[in-house]
């Protein structure tokens, strides 16, 4: 009787666009398609390293709820646009960049002054629009990180580094925008009960889709390696810093605002009316609870369920110690 598990022998990569690809692997033993597909998908969404703007200082601006003479967008919209700029740092973990422009015209990511080892992947991305006599002068701090980090959860070891006018941003470091996987039937000789795993991935251009899949697989291998090294007895205890003991660790996707789910305006407004601001708030609600929300019907509920399912989440989940300390409940 055959006791060895099958391993994929065929790998096919299909380019679907500049930053999109479909990776297919086969054959897998029955059930392994979902086991590995879900693991890779969760790692791709939550654990990839990337770069993002984390702090901004704008000349003449004290806080984000300001406006700038001669600039059509208010500061909030400028910051939102800035979050859409895709950075790529080579051989460094952080950098402070300058953007200075005056006179009528559109300000794009191309106007950001960068050293030779900093790359802007989408230089045509619009940041602001200047009217005649308008001027925009800002300093942008870009850092390397992982996942999603809300600005209000960031901590500074040196309180003296805080200064008036410095705006801390929510940072989405992940270069992966969307991931989905499907499991199809595969056949090897007379066996027809096998799996074919198809992973479709879209990135922001800072990393290719193929490299993202490789990186996620490497993370999984490193995490699982410890199980292959068990020799009995106890593993060395992890001595966590006193400041972090007892603190719950949540999947970064749960700390993201529900706005990032890109729901219809009707659904988004209904959730905010119920004080549901974060994805972690949403998944703890049941279907019956949401249906009791004014103006939220079955169609909106189905939309919410589909969007959550695309991220490997469902309604009615339980989270211990939610919300985390310091999470802004707005």
UniProtKB/Swiss-Prot annotation:
Reaction it catalyzes: RNA(n) + a ribonucleoside 5'-triphosphate = RNA(n+1) + diphosphate
Chain intervals for the UniProt region annotation (Alpha N-terminal domain (alpha-NTD)): 1-231
Domain notes: The N-terminal domain is essential for RNAP assembly and basal transcription, whereas the C-terminal domain is involved in interaction with transcriptional regulators and with upstream promoter elements.
Keyword annotations: DNA-directed RNA polymerase, Nucleotidyltransferase, Transcription, Transferase
GO annotation, cellular component aspect: cytoplasm; DNA-directed RNA polymerase complex
One of the GO biological process terms: DNA-templated transcription
InterPro entries per record: DNA-dir_RNA_pol_insert, DNA-dir_RNA_pol_RpoA/D/Rpb3, DNA-dir_RpoA, RBP11-like, RNAP_asu_C, RNApol_insert_sf
Family according to the record: Belongs to the RNA polymerase alpha chain family.
One Pfam family recorded for the sequence: RNA_pol_A_CTD
Name of the molecule in the record: DNA-directed RNA polymerase subunit alpha
Function: DNA-dependent RNA polymerase catalyzes the transcription of DNA into RNA using the four ribonucleoside triphosphates as substrates.
Group of enzyme by EC: transferase
EC number: 2.7.7.6
Residue segments, region Alpha C-terminal domain (alpha-CTD): 250-330
Keyword hit for Transcription: yes
């Amino acid at each position: 009787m055959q006791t060895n598990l099958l391993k994929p022998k065929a790998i096919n990569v299909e380019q679907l666009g500049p930053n999109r690809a479909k990776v297919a692997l086969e054959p897998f033993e029955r059930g392994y398609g979902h086991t590995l597909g879900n693991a890779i998908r969760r790692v791709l969404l939550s654990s990839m390293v990337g770069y993002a703007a984390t702090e901004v200082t704008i000349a003449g601006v004290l806080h984000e709820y300001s406006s700038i003479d001669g600039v059509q967008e208010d500061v909030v919209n400028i910051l939102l646009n800035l979050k859409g700029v895709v950075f790529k740092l080579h051989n460094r973990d952080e950098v402070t960049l300058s953007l200075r422009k005056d006179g009528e015209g559109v300000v794009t990511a191309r106007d950001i002054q960068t050293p030779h080892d900093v790359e802007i992947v989408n230089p045509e991305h619009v940041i602001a629009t200047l009217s005649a006599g308008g001027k925009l002068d800002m300093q942008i701090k870009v850092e390397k990180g992982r996942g999603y980090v809300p600005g209000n959860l960031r901590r500074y070891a040196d309180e003296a580094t805080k200064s008036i006018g410095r705006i801390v941003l929510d940072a989405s470091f992940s270069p992966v925008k969307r991931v989905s996987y499907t499991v199809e039937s595969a056949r090897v000789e007379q066996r027809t009960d096998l799996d074919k795993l198809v992973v479709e991935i879209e990135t922001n251009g800072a990393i290719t889709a193929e490299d993202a899949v490789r990186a996620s697989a490497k993370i999984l291998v490193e995490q699982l390696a410890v199980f292959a090294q068990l020799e009995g007895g106890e593993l060395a205890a992890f001595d966590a810093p006193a400041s972090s003991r007892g603190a719950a660790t949540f999947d970064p996707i749960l700390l993201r605002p529900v706005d990032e789910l890109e729901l219809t305006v009707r659904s988004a407004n209904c959730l905010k009316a119920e004080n549901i601001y974060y994805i972690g708030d949403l998944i703890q609600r049941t279907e019956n609870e949401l249906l009791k929300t004014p103006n939220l019907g079955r169609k909106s509920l189905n939309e919410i369920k589909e969007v959550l399912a695309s991220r490997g989440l469902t309604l009615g989940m339980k989270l211990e110690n939610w919300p985390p300390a310091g999470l802004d409940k707005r």
